[in-house]
Amino acid sequence: MRSSQNGGAMGGRAAGTGGGGPSAPVDKEVDYAQYFCTYSFLYHQKDMLSDRVRMDAYFNAVFQNKHHFEGKTVLDVGTGSGILAIWSAQAGARKVYAVEATKMADHARALVKANNLDHIVEVIEGSVEDISLPEKVDVIISEWMGYFLLRESMFDSVISARDRWLKPTGVMYPSHARMWLAPIKSNIADRKRNDFDGAMADWHNFSDEIKSYYGVDMGVLTKPFAEEQEKYYIQTAMWNDLNPQQIIGTPTIVKEMDCLTASVSEIEEVRSNVTSVINMEHTRLCGFGGWFDVQFSGRKEDPAQQEIELTTAPSEQHCTHWGQQVFIMSNPINVEEGDNLNLGLLMSRSKENHRLMEIELNCEIKEASGNPKESFKKTYFIE
């Protein structure tokens, strides 16, 4: 399971360049070095294959809905180790095209052959945007989700595959997705504030020593150093495995997607205005937790026989490698049961790396009576 603050991408597989669009061309070599190369290692695949929540959801979605696979053609976008392609074949697919952008394709091909499915599953190494298939497909299956759903921008590649290769009657696995946000309490906020204060104290000691020993005044760099440290300690979202008891207000949906119709422009910039009500007495608002869920529902004209949901919500029993993204506040605020939080969220892609995210969060807190209490605006980074 993932326990580090950030680190390499963990949610989706390596499928294609995606993400750039005409306004932001993607350098494929840079993109490979920053993103794809991580997925070419078996230890990374093992981490994901060890996530029982993830594995059980996809396994049940496929095998409890065999009618979507039996005798059908399937495209697995970003196959990684090949597990979803193998399951699709075992569920009765006539042909499975398993696309993988990295050398992990060699391992997937070996795994497919070892499971006697190489007459059904064809592993294709390459970007899904660049490959060509001999036919349209009935199903597109992919595990494309990143932190807070959209980090990594891999869904761009799934959209490209869908628009090129999915039949008009085809289904998407998963079919729908949602992003959630909720106010939380956590001692992480205090710990990170202490870390920031410690870094600044160390800087001031360093600055004094440089001036004392070497006669150079470093004071002009204090402000940019503070901004740098604040981004690292306070503004960068953290991976965390939240306990449900840390949620102090109603979780709210900030984005819903139909994977059959969603467009790249729809996810390049996510805007949402929602309200959360504090439901805990005498507590502190220390930040916000963000997570996602996806559904395997088929399509309206061809629904799943058994709907399956994969959720990364805080749980006492089940942790996923995605965890939750925590957006901490440098100065927690005392709140009371019944207080209303009017939230405005804007999530966009980093200008430096389209697979990373920037979030602007506006919050206006009102008492249950409607009287204004406090308001703030924060910027966060999902890296």
UniProtKB/Swiss-Prot annotation:
InterPro entries: Arg_MeTrfase, PRMT_dom, SAM-dependent_MTases_sf
All residue ranges annotated as the SAM-dependent MTase PRMT-type domain in the record: 29-360
EC nos: 2.1.1.319
Domain of life of the native organism: Eukaryota
Record keyword S-adenosyl-L-methionine present: yes
Keywords, sorted A to Z: Methyltransferase, S-adenosyl-L-methionine, Transferase
GO biological process: peptidyl-arginine methylation, to asymmetrical-dimethyl arginine; vegetative to reproductive phase transition of meristem
Reactions mediated catalytically: L-arginyl-[protein] + 2 S-adenosyl-L-methionine = N(omega),N(omega)-dimethyl-L-arginyl-[protein] + 2 S-adenosyl-L-homocysteine + 2 H(+)
Single GO MF descriptor: histone arginine N-methyltransferase activity
SUBUNIT field: Ring-like homodimer.
Matches recorded under PANTHER family: PROTEIN ARGININE N-METHYLTRANSFERASE (PTHR11006), PROTEIN ARGININE N-METHYLTRANSFERASE PRMT10 (PTHR11006:SF68)
The protein's name in its UniProt record: Protein arginine N-methyltransferase PRMT10
Origin species: Arabidopsis thaliana
